[in-house]
């Protein structure tokens, strides 16, 4: 090799040789001499290594926050939480859900063993508190969420009730004293519930109207139920929404519009022009949105005329409608004169979106409903329950509906609340739902879809690697989570998965012994991920970089400081 003089090989030839090597060999060769070291850090060399190693499409640009191709390669290789560092076995049954506090200092877990456990997130995770919900007639705990200042924990689960129903209940737990502050009925249980403000939460109730028609009512509840006056609300009705074809509202969550202005690091990958638009804006008045003009007119005269035409068609034998189809058609017509149109959005950045799964064709959740929550709706203050009900418009219309043409099994928001990630098991192309109680078969592959809540458009090609095997009637929720750069999800194939949000590539598979139900990134440290499984364990995963830092030997103190430390009181 060169000894400080002229190099024996020109840089261009060394570069061509390095192109044929793998990343590890390039780094090893860079230790030989200064010339090879310089070539081994060449930007064009690492650009080629990056696209080849990670198999990223060449038209996908580098992450906008990246400073070099070498550092970007290192980020995906060295900073993904894929090294198992701890296994928690305190639960005695399937672990269903995980949630972090906003500070990242604590997290909560829910399980089929009917406990909510709260953990200290130190370098070695330890159990802080366990709340047994069986004395409250719960079957199991399903979901939890910390409020914004991490002073309260919302926990929800299946409440057996007097008739062994599938209704649920929400409990609010103080994180200072671990006292149970309040309990709120929640039906169906997979509404889960969520925080709207630091001291108010959203729950649901379901009222049957017919065999396949119902009404979902979403309630705003005060976390503290003790009041000094009967004229002070502890609960207020937020929205009342009609359900057709055995569908119900489930999986509610809140997106904060004021956080949309955070730096946008998510760029569209490739040509998205060919993607079909899945978003239907129900708040607009364009002709394209009205699929059946007869069903979108208002006024009692139009409703009566529509009903007359439906019944005449049935009596004349022209319309071969099933009982379910007839009930749905009549319910749609009757609701037209009793539905409040969406309120015009304003420029107030304090507005929030209520997001939930729903449907219009079958009981299987195949649509995402979005309803704007205005500032005056974010408090229980106002008329006492029972007052102000004079209006005939007792249903609320949705602002937006996203149809995914498949069974939705999970949703999660990006840290800035702008992007909605959706786990969905697709229906066969061109499938038609003839019976609301018999939805189409669902795919074994899970598609991870991405929607921009600022533009209400699908912005990414579907991520696909994880799998599920249960049929429609046994399908259960797979919780996902999103960090600044990564998105993770569980799966029924005994693995958790991590993808890069920008490049749309799978970076890691995290093994369990059974179905992985939930994943959670630390909100303060995306190089820490938790996974929860039916194998009754919670596993903690850290990045190779963090593992090296934690395992590095600490330098021994110098003699003077050693003597000084030993003589301190």
Curated annotation (Swiss-Prot):
One Pfam entry name: WD40
Pathway(s) of this molecule: Protein modification; protein ubiquitination
Keyword Repeat part of the UniProt annotation: yes
Signal peptide boundaries: none
InterPro entries linked to this entry: F-box-like_dom_sf (IPR036047), F-box_dom (IPR001810), FBXW5 (IPR042508), WD40/YVTN_repeat-like_dom_sf (IPR015943), WD40_repeat_dom_sf (IPR036322), WD40_rpt (IPR001680)
Record GO biological process: proteasome-mediated ubiquitin-dependent protein catabolic process; protein ubiquitination; regulation of centrosome duplication; regulation of mitotic nuclear division; SCF-dependent proteasomal ubiquitin-dependent protein catabolic process
Domain notes per entry: The F-box domain mediates interaction with components of SCF (SKP1-CUL1-F-box protein) complexes, while WD repeats mediate interaction with components of DCX (DDB1-CUL4-X-box) complexes. The D-box (destruction box) mediate the interaction with APC proteins, and acts as a recognition signal for degradation via the ubiquitin-proteasome pathway.
Protein's name according to its UniProt entry: F-box/WD repeat-containing protein 5
UniProt lineage: Eukaryota, Metazoa, Chordata, Craniata, Vertebrata
